[in-house]
Amino acid sequence: AAEATVQPVRRHGVDAGIFFSDIMVPLRLAGVGVEIEPGVGPVLDHPYRTRDSIDELLSHRYGEGSWTDSTGRARDCAEGAQSVRDGVATAVRELGSTPLIGFGGAPFTLAAYMVEGRPSRDHMAARVLAASDPGAWDALMTWCARVSADFITAQIDAGASAAQLFDSWVGSLSPRTYRESVAPYSRMVAQRVAGAVSPVTGERAPLIHFGTGSAPILSDMAEVGAHCVGVDWKTDLSWAIEQVPGKAVQGNLDPALLQAPWHVIEQAVRHILDAGCSAPGHVFNLGHGVPPTTDPDVLTRIVELVHELGDAR
């Protein structure tokens, strides 16, 4: 994990590294049976859709107990949690003066995987549970919030200077459902993480909150308590900044443009940087992940361009 974290910084000269992990790691290290199946994604031993199954889950704690891997071997959660801390500490040492950003999944995205039992396009079962059994949903989401916060806090304690809370599936929700059934639990994470002080900076680590397809709920996401709001490529950055007054923003180059001619990329980068000037702070990045077919040299050129234009402002 540490080497994969440091490589992009060495290769491209970006201004921060982000801890290389998986959104399912905190679930596994809380004793939940989950494996990554090739071509499918995370698959749980069983879905958590009933009050009984969720009640059984509530005794699980991050870094306690054990989980069973695909070979049937029992693995110690405490050892796994220690390996996360060690990976962060190693990455921090390797990065030197370059800060490390921690990583964690937001409660809804974790809960969606748990209720569905595997990846889903519409997260129908999770949405049904939230609407039909608020008590069970509250128990599950509170548990997910605690596990996510513990995972992120552990990374900050080990040296991460900031953290990012990813809500990959939040775009499947209506604004009302988000406000009533999801935002309170993301706020729990933000509140629990707020007290974590990075030993590297000696200060409380700022939190970035990002969700895909989040334009309809962007203003609500800004109220969760993060210091910076991530913006995906489908949302106009100038408009997004108006929705989150007083917040820094992160975003939001369309990953597809990485395949475009350089003059197209340069124009898009300049446009995003111009838009970002109206925010209290702007972290330039992609609006989603890097496509695997991307030429690494293109990424390096983008970083160089952002630095050049940023220094000139």
At which residue positions do the language-model features occur?
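Active-site loop segments of alpha/beta catalytic cores
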Residues: 80-313
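Short alpha-helical segments and helix-capping/turn motifs at coil-helix boundaries
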Residues: 1-11, 84-93
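Short, conserved acidic/polar surface loops in the N-terminal third of protein domains
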Residues: 28-32, 47, 111-116
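Glycine-rich loop at the start of a catalytic domain that most often binds anionic cofactors/ligands
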Residues: 24-39
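A gly/proline- and charged-residue-enriched helix-loop-helix capping module
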Residues: 39-94, 98
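Surface-exposed, active-site-proximal loop segments in enzymatic domains
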Residues: 32-36, 52-72, 115-131
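Short, conserved beta-strand segments within well-ordered enzyme catalytic domains
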Residues: 16-20, 26, 99-101
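Catalytic domains of carbohydrate-active enzymes, especially glycoside hydrolases
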Residues: 3-20, 157-158, 223
